[in-house]
Amino acid sequence: AKIIMSQHGDDIEYRARKFVNDNVKTVDDAILGAKDIIAEWVSESANARNRVRSIYARTASLVCKVVKGKELEGEKFSNYFNTEELLKRCASHRLLAMLRGEAEGVLKLNLKADDSEVLEKLYKMFVKGSGMSSRMVSSAIEDSYKRLIKPSIETEMMNAAKQEADRVAIDTFAQNLRQLLFAPPLGKRRVLAIDPGYRT
């Protein structure tokens, strides 16, 4: 993995032969194993994850689709059938409603980002040339993003969005309750009261 990652020279298959043993049967297995290790390295890079997170925060869209065959059952969620909007602009009450729809098995939510922009950023971070070893690194980066980084960042972004939506909902409820508790019981009508404890 270090040999490929260094991206010096293209005699990778020749150099991979010394890693063939009882556990690693072929040169191809050795190269695949090395690419898996590189994918892990990319995934564990805090800098790489921060770049991906930044792109998602700016451009990720929340895609909401109705589960096939659930159109009638989930009619109350019909406003959200087959919609797409930027996650950062999604109102808290809409997000919470969509999440309820997903929990009830009516809606399916996904985050969609510009994968080509993400991969371009990652390539710039790790790929140093255009030879065979660099192409292998590019392949490992793509695998790392699709298999490891993307699912993790999507879960993180959705959890953060839900947490913020919950906070907004609680604040709104508290504000409405406060107004209700402090409102006069009979509105603007005048009330005459007698205090039985008052002595003359």
Residue spans of the language-model regions?
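Duplex nucleic acid-engaging cores and interfaces of nucleic-acid transaction enzymes
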Residues: A1-L186, R190-L192, R199-T200
